[in-house]
Amino acid sequence: MNIPRQLSTFVIGLFFCGAVYGASYPLKVSSANPRILVDQNNVPFLVVGDSPHSLWVNLTSAESAAYLANRAAHGVNSLWVNLVIIRPVEGRPDCSLVDGTKPFTNTISGTRSYDLTTPNEAYFAHVDEVMRMAETNGILVMIDPLETAGFLRTALQNGSTRCRAYGQFLGNRYKNFPNIIWQHGNDFQAWSVATNDAVITAVALGIKDNDSNHLHTIELNYQASSSLDDPNWAPIVGLNLAYTYYATYAEVLHAYNQSASIPVFMGEANYEYDKQQNEDGGSPRILRMQEYWTMLCGATGQLYGNKYTWRFLPGWQNYLDSPGVVQLGYMANLFRTRKWYNLVPDQTHVFVTAGYGKFVSSGPPASAPGGRFAGNDYVTAALTPDGTLGMAYLPQGGTITVAMSKLQKPITARWFDPSGNTFRAIAGSPFANTGKHRFTPPRKNSAGDPDWVLVLEAGAGP
């Protein structure tokens, strides 16, 4: 028994005061503000997610229950899970569960690919069980029904007719599970090839044939993309998934500006402890940068990821309470206790008028919107239309100039330390809402890094 871990989880649960926030699923796009997701009671839903891709295939039921309870205690309300997995780094060559149960009972004649029209009841019964555990913990599951990094070949060998039938099976089976969003794709590099797109679209359309209750989205290609880059998915998706391993502000704003009628969220960026070639990796500081950039560029939330828990590598339990997920919780609490859903990105710098750094539109390499993280000093800022809340994230410290007339008085100004979950008062606060004011954060936060969040709000604030 790991007493320190149990204690930390208990404290986290107290800190978040009911981290699941009682969302009434299924989610929908807000009719009043299509930039955000809401639950069935029209309560704004901030996506605070993890990415345990191999949850169903690599954990037992008991391990799944422990993992889900831990994530709920950390304030996580959403998970990305792949329904079937073939790649050895995530699952097993035959895609089986830990007990050897395979997802399908037959293969396509003359191939090694599963026949998608022959689902194995025992496999999907396990999926059902874990889905109910997630619901008990108040957690939304973003199900990838046929992840394209490993199963595109299988989809092509099945063809569109079988793929649609598979989707119909899923739609019928899961239409009454409230806590679902259907998330297609996954490193879908070749989506622009019509035959590839057609079979994955067929799965989605099959689901929609029997399930009109749940939203759909799709992850396209790395290193940077959004769902709406593929026009064939525009009639299907109700949520625009931004994907980038570069500074997130560029891709999130790209997705935000593609459509005012559906929300955007960051579906994948750098994972904690992970670093691939030509990527910056997932240190706590980089995770904070991508998270706060994302939130102040108009997103309805984001998914975190962890090298040890997306694959469930040996010893994954030792990484459940990592700095990255703890600081993700700090971020979530900062926004959840404020009207984050009314924030509008300050793209034209009428709010933060100077000191906002350089917006890196590309590279190096040239295909990298946002560029690398090291030295990236772009300040993302957002403001509510009524002027009751303004926020800015300063990744490298420095001094910014704020147009105080955009805010309502009296203006309480504080610095939030995103690494330590503490506020620091600013001399002279509260301020009048006239003229401009220069704000300079303390030199270093509690982690010894230069990033801070400026929080300006009418009255005393939460």
For every predicted segment, state its role:
Residues K175-P178, S212, A260, R336-N342:
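Proline-centered flexible-loop/turn and helix-kink motifs
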